[in-house]
């Protein structure tokens, strides 16, 4: 069954993979060759005068360039937003040029996009070809587009001219077009964006006759030459260039070639001068930025040294202030502790017989730490003397407003009846505080 399928395929002449690959190679070679011929024709005929749309050679060149840019262009768009398509629903090489040439400085892409009389992608592509030729930047546009390999592979299938080394040859050929002045009027003119272009190959086809075959006229000429007594040439069918017209034609062709080469030489010299001026400007800008960088580095070092000196000075001041601050804090802490202990009431003021004793029991954990109260070490001596007078003369509890409001919570908690009832239940963690009028009672475990 497989053999019959292969025979059927061969009989129908279906293209195989090898034949398809050959077709792609032949297409690339044909397009590049005919493009070279077209560029040479333009350079020979229109070096001294501008070219417009009425020139048949330009129309053919534009068709060739459009075919090259459309060679193996992907028909279906990759995944993306719907607005990515052109307005006519068809994709053309303009979609590729619009993205790949957007990085060209001062490009004409936005101008073509804003043209009101051009709507289809094919018409915009043809308008771009004309504008790029008038700007003499066609080679620059194609070179920039080829550098964007990711975008190029996104729009073209394998085997396309834009993905092969022929694209580099194309950019080299397009450089010579900078010697020609193109003049097109796109304002108000509606470019045809529906009809496909057709390349005219007839101006570039030339039949070369073999030496083995002679026409009747050449045979007759050979016979006449053989009967004459004059010396005949080695190949009688090749005419000798002996008349003045032939020499004049040769001279005219050489003059045209010289003009073309001279125009290209002038363009390249101008381009070199432009690049040299740009290089000088960049070198001057580089030197200026280098000086700014050095100045910024020196200023940074100066500021760093100044900040280091400030840090060292602050450290010295801090070191000198630390020893003088500890002594007042420690002394104030001791005075505050003494005043707090002396202000606690005796048990006789509670008027309970079971609590009558010359000593009071307090839990060790009920003492408030002096560290949180160190901020109050600056209490006035009047408040301390007032606390000592109240210890011997009256029961605990302020008659008026206590000048030490931070002690009210502690006084209330110790003077309450439930706290006095719980004194008998204190155990191993209790301590005795003497009710004697001495300055600071000694603490001793029970």
UniProtKB/Swiss-Prot annotation:
The keyword Lipid biosynthesis does not apply. Residues 52-189 form the RUN domain. GO terms for cellular component: intracellular membrane-bounded organelle. Residues 216-239, 372-403 are annotated as: Disordered. Residues 267-322 form a coiled coil. InterPro entries: Run_dom (IPR004012), Run_dom_sf (IPR037213), RUN_RUNDC3A (IPR047338), RUNDC3A_B (IPR047340). It holds the Pfam family RUN. GO terms for biological process: positive regulation of cGMP-mediated signaling. Residues 385-394 have a biased composition (Basic and acidic residues). Keywords: Coiled coil, Phosphoprotein. The modification Phosphoserine is found at residues 232, 416, 419. It comes from the Eukaryota. Residues 372-384 have a biased composition (Polar residues). Residues 1-298 are annotated as: Interaction with RAP2A. Brain. The modification Phosphothreonine is found at residue 215. Belongs to the RUNDC3 family. Interacts with the GTP-bound form of RAP2A. May act as an effector of RAP2A in neuronal cells. This is RUN domain-containing protein 3A. It comes from Mus musculus (Mouse).
């Amino acid at each position: 069954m497989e053999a019959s399928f292969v025979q059927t395929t061969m009989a129908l002449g279906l293209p195989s993979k090898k034949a398809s690959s050959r077709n792609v190679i032949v297409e690339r070679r044909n397009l590049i060759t005919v493009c070279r011929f077209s560029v040479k024709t333009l350079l020979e005929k229109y070096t001294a005068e501008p070219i417009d749309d009425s020139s048949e050679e330009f129309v053919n060149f534009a068709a060739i360039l459009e075919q090259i840019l459309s060679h193996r262009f992907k028909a279906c768009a990759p995944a993306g937003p719907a607005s990515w398509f052109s307005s006519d629903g068809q994709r053309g090489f303009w979609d590729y040029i619009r993205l790949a040439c957007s990085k060209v400085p001062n490009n004409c892409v936005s101008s073509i996009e804003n043209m009101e009389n051009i709507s289809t992608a094919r018409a915009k592509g043809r308008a771009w070809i004309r504008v790029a030729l008038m700007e003499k930047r066609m080679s620059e546009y194609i070179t920039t587009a080829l550098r964007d390999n990711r975008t190029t592979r996104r729009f073209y299938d394998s085997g396309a001219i834009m993905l092969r080394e022929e694209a580099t040859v194309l950019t080299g050929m397009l450089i010579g077009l900078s010697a020609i002045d193109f003049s097109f009027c796109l304002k108000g003119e509606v470019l045809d964006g529906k009809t496909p272009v057709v390349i005219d190959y007839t101006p570039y086809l030339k039949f070369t006759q073999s030496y083995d075959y002679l026409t009747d006229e050449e045979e007759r000429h050979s016979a006449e030459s053989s009967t004459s007594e004059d010396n005949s040439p080695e190949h009688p069918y090749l005419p000798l260039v002996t008349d003045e017209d032939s020499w004049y034609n040769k001279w005219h062709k050489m003059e045209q070639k010289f003009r073309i080469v001279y125009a290209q030489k002038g363009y390249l010299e101008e381009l070199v001068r432009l690049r040299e001026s740009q290089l000088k400007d960049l070198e001057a800008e580089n030197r200026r930025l280098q000086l700014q960088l050095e100045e910024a580095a020196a200023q940074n070092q100066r500021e760093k040294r100044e900040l280091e000196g400030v840090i060292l000075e602050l450290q010295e001041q801090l070191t000198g202030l630390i020893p003088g601050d500890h002594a007042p804090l420690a002394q104030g802490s001791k005075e505050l502790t003494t005043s707090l202990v002396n202000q606690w009431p005796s048990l006789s003021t509670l008027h309970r017989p079971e609590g009558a004793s010359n000593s009071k029991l307090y839990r060790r954990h009920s003492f408030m730490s002096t560290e949180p109260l160190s901020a109050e070490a600056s209490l006035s001596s009047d408040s301390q003397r007032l606390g000592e007078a109240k210890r011997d003369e009256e029961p605990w509890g302020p008659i008026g407003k206590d000048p030490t409001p931070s002690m009210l919570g502690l006084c209330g908690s110790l003077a309450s009846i439930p706290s006095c009832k719980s004194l008998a239940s204190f155990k191993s963690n209790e301590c005795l505080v003497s009710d004697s009028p001495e300055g600071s009672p000694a603490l001793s475990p029970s």
